[in-house]
Amino acid sequence: MDSSSDEVLFVGTADAEHVEMYLKAIWHIKERNEPVKISTIAKMLNIRQPSVVQMLKKLNGQQLVEYNKAGVSLTEGGEKVGSNMMRNSRVLEVLMDSSLKVKIDEEMVCGIEHHMNKQFTDALCTMLN
């Protein structure tokens, strides 16, 4: 097989996607002006509370959230990732609904949003007005 025609496949990092989903969930809960609680995150992500605690400790160590007995809040870095994920999600929803005229498929949106970079999202925004 000629090396110029070799197909390159990219494998996403599930760990990075998990981090993004937690940050998006926290951002979304905060946006609704609700207290960010472990139980709320667990319910939103359909996972058990001990798993949420474990991930919050990890995110705290990565300085993406501030997690302590008082609660959970996003750091500046966590806020940036969370808001980017929400933006990607909303742009995809507008694309599906307004341009493609298909029913919004949240599972599909969730699968795509993790792979969008700023340039792609900006281009979609421009295309969608």
Label the predicted regions:
Residues 1-24:
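Short alpha-helical segments that sit at the start of domains
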Residues 32-42, 70:
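Short acidic, hydrophobic short linear motifs in intrinsically disordered regions
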Residues 50:
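Key DNA-contact positions within bacterial/archaeal DNA-binding proteins
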Residues 56-57:
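Short, hydrophobic-biased segments on the C-terminal half of alpha helices
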Residues 60-70:
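A short, conserved structural fragment
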